[in-house]
């Protein structure tokens, strides 16, 4: 039985738990635990998951994999300790790795601990192509994020713009992924994931657009290299519980987790 600990007790955590506990066959395959702020989270968790409030207790539980499903802060707070203990660490808040010192430190701890850092593709696809294209000198990668105003309420309010008054697309940001991931830690983990797969945080160009006509959370990726060109457009439905996050993200994490333990990896 594989032991998986999840950091965070919010929407993504609950979705992961429900998926991995959906059938008796899955419950026989996975033993699950959650690191939460309280033994009784505000939203109840499935009864088959153990709940801890201390990372040392989680590691004493001897997980095979720790899944961060909380925030960039959780990556900084818990990543090093898990990797030093020899436990592989799956990072959903990939924007934390825009901190190059943190990224280098976590990588060194993973190497020393004989374990791995895993970054799921999250809301996008095509990372296998991007990894190959990035091996060609001069490869270029550009990413455009388009989300409806509901995904950017605090940002619009800070600009003095009423979300209901947005009638035309607004460019919130244009620049490197390194800056985008830090400026928008809850919305642009995709940019950091692309950068890790491709040409790096500084070279990956990002444009962030608030679009009242967007049918969902839209991700547009353009890649150009000596091997050819590649364009991908994805329109994801927002999570019913969190419009900042695409609905597909949690299931992608589940798929990545299952692949980690599978004898056949795609």
Pin down the residues of each PLM region.
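Extreme N-terminal starter segment of soluble prokaryotic enzymes
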Residues: 1-5
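Active-site-lining helix/loop region of Rossmann-like oxidoreductase modules
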Residues: 7, 15, 118, 123-266
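Hydrophobic/small residue at the entry helix of a nucleotide-binding pocket
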Residues: 12
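A short, Lys/Arg-enriched amphipathic alpha-helix followed by its capping loop at the start of a domain
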Residues: 15, 19-29
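Beta-loop-alpha module in the N-terminal Rossmann-like domain of NAD(P)-dependent dehydrogenases
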Residues: 55-57, 61-84, 96-100
């Amino acid at each position: 039985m594989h032991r998986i600990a999840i950091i965070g007790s919010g929407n993504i955590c609950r979705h992961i738990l429900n998926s991995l506990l959906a059938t008796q066959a899955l419950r026989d395959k996975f033993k699950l635990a959650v690191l939460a702020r309280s033994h009784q989270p505000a939203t109840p968790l499935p009864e088959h998951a153990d709940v801890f409030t201390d990372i040392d207790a989680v590691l004493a539980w001897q997980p095979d994999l720790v899944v961060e499903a909380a925030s960039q802060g959780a990556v900084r707070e818990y990543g090093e300790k898990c990797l030093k203990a020899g436990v592989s660490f799956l990072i959903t808040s990939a924007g934390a790795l825009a901190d190059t010192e943190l990224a280098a430190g976590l990588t060194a701890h993973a190497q020393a601990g004989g374990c791995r850092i895993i970054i799921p593709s999250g809301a996008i696809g095509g990372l296998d192509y991007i990894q190959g294209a990035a091996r060609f000198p001069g490869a270029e990668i550009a990413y455009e994020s388009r989300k409806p105003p509901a995904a950017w309420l605090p940002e619009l309010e800070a600009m003095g713009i009423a979300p209901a008054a947005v009638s035309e697309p607004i460019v919130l940001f244009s620049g490197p992924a390194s800056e985008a991931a830090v400026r928008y830690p809850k919305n642009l983990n995709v940019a950091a994931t692309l950068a890790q797969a491709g040409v790096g945080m500084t070279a990956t160009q990002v444009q962030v657009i608030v679009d009242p006509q967007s049918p969902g959370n839209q991700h547009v990726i353009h890649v150009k290299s000596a091997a050819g060109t590649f364009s991908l457009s994805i329109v994801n439905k927002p999570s019913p519980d969190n419009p900042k996050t695409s609905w597909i993200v949690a299931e992608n994490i589940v798929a990545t987790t299952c692949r980690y333990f599978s004898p056949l990896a795609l």
